[in-house]
């Protein structure tokens, strides 16, 4: 999968050796020149085990394992320069530490501007529909527009006031990320005109997931290809149809663009079906509730997912 695609999704059941597989994959990518400086990030509770597993598998490997002291305010700049200026076989750190790495402000500006453009397009479509649009839907999009404008203003200020001594992710030369327990980053921002549809999740997303998008886009721009990251999880999709779309948003932006899928609504129009049911609310009244309940065009969607996914179950490992 890594040699053919340059990344993807490891949909591996818990207990099937995911940690060792990840360490071997990172080292082999470096050895085969598929990546020059791979990075592994994991949960704070697991990251020491990941580093120990890597070191046990490859005792002579040059690993940079980030300690809590390395990410103290006094040492952080020196540590970032250490990543930038040295040719490590692998850099290993926790999710929280990864979130403290500055991202390229110019790239942030481009991504946030693209998100804002999509919101403005959605607002224009809704305004043209006139009376058929709920006030809540308009209000939600206008709030999202305001939040994106505030983020853009902050990034523009960072560009103007930037000093040359700040090393960001782009300058570090990381060209592949292995993300252990990748479901921790599933709450990525997305744009939609759907209002009060159950099961969509929070379209605003989290800053943690947005930072991951910035990092992955940095790698994709450097290589000129999709992927550039490997997601490893036992629960890649748990409780929302949007989670599948967001995996593609992270990893397959060029392919989505080729299919003219530029937002969640365009994807849902092709691959998901919305139903309307009558349910009891908290006050025991019957209310109408919309939700995305089914995937449609399942063979095409499965093929799209399987192109970049490696499956492993306990039964398949003889467990």
Where are these regions (language model features)?
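Walker A/P-loop
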Residues: 5-25
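Post-Walker A helix-loop "phosphate-sensing" segment adjacent to the P-loop in P-loop NTPases
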Residues: 29-35, 251-256
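Conserved Walker A/P-loop ATP-binding site and its immediately adjacent core
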Residues: 19-24, 34-57, 62-63, 70, ...
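A solvent-exposed, charged loop/short amphipathic helix patch at secondary-structure junctions
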Residues: 109-131, 135, 190-205
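Hydrophobic residues on the short alpha-helix immediately C-terminal to a glycine-rich phosphate/catalytic loop
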Residues: 13, 24-29, 50, 215, ...
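Pre-Walker A (Motif I) flank of P-loop NTPase domains
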Residues: 4-10, 36, 89, 226-228
């Amino acid at each position: 999968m890594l040699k053919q695609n340059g990344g993807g999704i490891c949909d591996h059941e818990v207990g099937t050796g995911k940690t060792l597989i990840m360490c071997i994959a990172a080292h082999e990518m470096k050895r085969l020149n598929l990546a020059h400086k791979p990075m592994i990030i994991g949960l704070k509770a697991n990251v020491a085990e990941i580093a120990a597993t890597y070191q046990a598998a490859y005792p002579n490997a040059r690993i940079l394992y980030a300690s809590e002291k390395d990410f103290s305010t006094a040492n952080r700049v020196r540590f970032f320069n250490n990543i930038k200026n040295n040719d490590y076989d692998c850099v290993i750190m926790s999710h929280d530490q990864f979130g403290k790495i500055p991202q390229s402000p110019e790239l942030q500006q481009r991504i946030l501007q693209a998100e804002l453009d999509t919101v403005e397009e959605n607002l224009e479509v809704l305004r043209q529909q006139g009376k058929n649009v709920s006030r809540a839907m308009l209000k939600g999009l206008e709030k999202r527009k305001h939040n994106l404008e505030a983020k853009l203003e902050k990034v523009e200020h960072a560009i103007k006031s930037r000093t040359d001594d700040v090393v960001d992710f782009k300058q570090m030369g990381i060209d592949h990320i292995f993300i252990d327990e990748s479901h921790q980053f599933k709450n990525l921002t997305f744009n939609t005109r759907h209002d009060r549809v159950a099961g969509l999740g929070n379209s605003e997303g989290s800053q943690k997931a947005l930072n991951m998008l910035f990092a992955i886009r940095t790698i994709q721009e450097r290589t000129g290809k999709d992927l550039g990251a490997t997601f490893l999880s036992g629960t890649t999709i748990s409780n929302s149809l949007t989670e599948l779309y967001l995996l593609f948003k992270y990893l397959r932006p060029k392919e989505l663009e080729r299919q003219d899928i530029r937002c969640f609504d365009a994807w849902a129009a092709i691959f998901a079906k919305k139903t309307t049911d009558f349910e009891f609310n908290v006050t025991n009244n019957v209310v109408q509730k919309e939700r995305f309940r089914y995937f449609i065009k399942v063979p095409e969607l499965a093929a799209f997912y399987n192109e970049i996914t490696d499956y492993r179950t306990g039964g398949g490992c003889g467990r």
